[in-house]
């Protein structure tokens, strides 16, 4: 598994299972990585386009930050106009993926009871180890949001609703 991060977060990335850590401030992952089966993109479209190039033939790029694809339009039962808009939003990246012999899909993250139950079991058993950066009391919600907006959180930012 490979990831990009700043040099300051290299040890954290390795502790979470990364075999290869690339300092995005100094290196271009596109020139270092190749022949991956799957890419999970949480960055911008420019990074997503680079990610397509590190996949092996028939590889898959999954983006949680967009652009939404036609399947997403169907999944949310969008009206015909919105389906057309969604299709247009991802037309460029889908075309580039096809030219490279890989596929692209958009994954819309949402809370679903059954999935959350499964995730809870994985956390409780230690399979998933969430990284919590900071915990804010409820009355400091604005501070928590401001911290998230800095883009410098190293894990989850939690807002504690009530005292235990």
What kind of region is each of these model predictions?
Residues 1-164:
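Terminal helix/beta-alpha structural elements that buttress the NAD(P)+-binding lobe
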């Amino acid at each position: 598994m490979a990831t990009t991060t700043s040099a300051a977060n290299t040890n954290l990335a390795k502790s979470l299972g990364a075999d290869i850590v690339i300092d995005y401030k100094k290196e271009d992952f596109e020139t270092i990585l190749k022949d991956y089966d799957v890419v999970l993109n949480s960055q911008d479209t420019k990074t997503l386009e680079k990610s397509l190039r590190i996949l092996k033939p028939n590889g898959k790029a999954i983006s949680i930050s967009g652009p939404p694809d036609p399947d997403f339009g169907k999944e949310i039962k969008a009206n015909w106009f919105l389906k057309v808009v969604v299709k247009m939003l991802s037309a460029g990246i889908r075309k580039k993926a096809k030219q490279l012999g890989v596929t692209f899909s958009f994954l819309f993250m949402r809370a679903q009871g059954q999935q959350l139950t499964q995730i809870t079991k994985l956390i409780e058993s230690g399979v998933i180890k969430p990284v919590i950066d900071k915990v804010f009391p409820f009355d400091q919600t604005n501070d928590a949001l401001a911290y998230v907006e800095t883009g410098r959180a190293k894990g989850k930012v939690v807002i504690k609703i009530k005292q235990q």
